[in-house]
UniProtKB/Swiss-Prot annotation:
Gene Ontology molecular functions: nicotinate-nucleotide-dimethylbenzimidazole phosphoribosyltransferase activity
Protein name (record): UPF0284 protein PCC7424_2681
Matches recorded under InterPro entries: Nict_dMeBzImd_PRibTrfase, Nict_dMeBzImd_PRibTrfase_arc, Nict_dMeBzImd_PRibTrfase_sf
Domain of life: Bacteria
Family: Belongs to the UPF0284 family.
Organism: Gloeothece citriformis (strain PCC 7424)
Amino acid sequence: MISIYTQPTLAQAWLQKYQGSCPIFALILGYTQTGLIPGISAAGATPQDRQYTAIADAEFLVKGCVKTPQYPLPPLNVGVSPVYISRAVIEAFNIPIYLFNAGLPDPPSVPFIDLEGIPAHCLSSGQALPLDKVYHLYTQGVKWGEKLALIAPKSYLMIGECVVGGTTTALAVLRGLGVDAAGKVNSSHPQCNHAQKWSVVQLGLQKLGTLSDIDPFRLVAAVGDPMQIVAAGMAIAASRTIGVMLAGGTQMLAVYALIKSIISHFQERANLSQLVVGTTRWVAEDKSGDTIGLAQLIPNVPLLATQLNLNQSRYPQLQVYEQGYVKEGVGAGGCAIASYLYQGWTQQQLLNAIESLIAQSVEIKIEHNS
């Protein structure tokens, strides 16, 4: 159920250490106006929908299927939200969830921890976030990383994200850190919109001027999003005492690169042997990107992925994942990995749990329309 794509020795040691452990899950919600660019993301049918994607995902993650959600999951052009995968695992194993608002236009409808962040401007402006806000969010991330490590002293922390447009800010941060990520990132589209992403990134980076040995905080302030810096601080602090899985694809590879830059620039203490990136097979083997090649450009990052396959699902909304739609989000890959690592779940057990949630949603929709 789990494949290792890079740094097999480090990854295998991490998996062995945390086999049988129940993780805790920190989901960091953020927002960037980059997500409003037409066509930049498929996580929400329209730019208007995308403003509420993270809030709707958070509500479903915590509450599951309810008859009258305050924020219904946005209509995706093709495929259901990856939060169905995350929720299936969270519900089955009662994994503790900590929701963090790093900077949303509106507050979530379920209990959350407010980090006093703000939504990011479009990265093309070269002024995504005020620098003092970036420092504040990093400090908050470190503080909560330390707190969460005390809650799970012999286990690991999964850090997930929900940021529409986040693979584009990830590309910008990676490129700013000197990683040649152009053409290698993923997106929620079946064929990644590399040219569009790259043109937006170039606009933002040009306004920064020289990129040689750039201060990572200044880089995030210019072209990043609020989730990235919180996740970096949280992972750095938690890694000192417990395991950390950055649960995501391109966005979490960018966070890993950011972590390395922060450690290098500011001599922050961290234990990178405790840190892995966990995603889905649809991201790791995405032929319209090059996730494995990207991971290999970031020294020593262990990349794992669930081998969950949805071809045999009875729901077309799940089968389309095998055609390249959606791929990842809300820690879906990490949660699928956790289901195997904690309780040895098979492919069929996980599929049954996901389909059970979809069946509930379909039933509620039929009742609502009748």
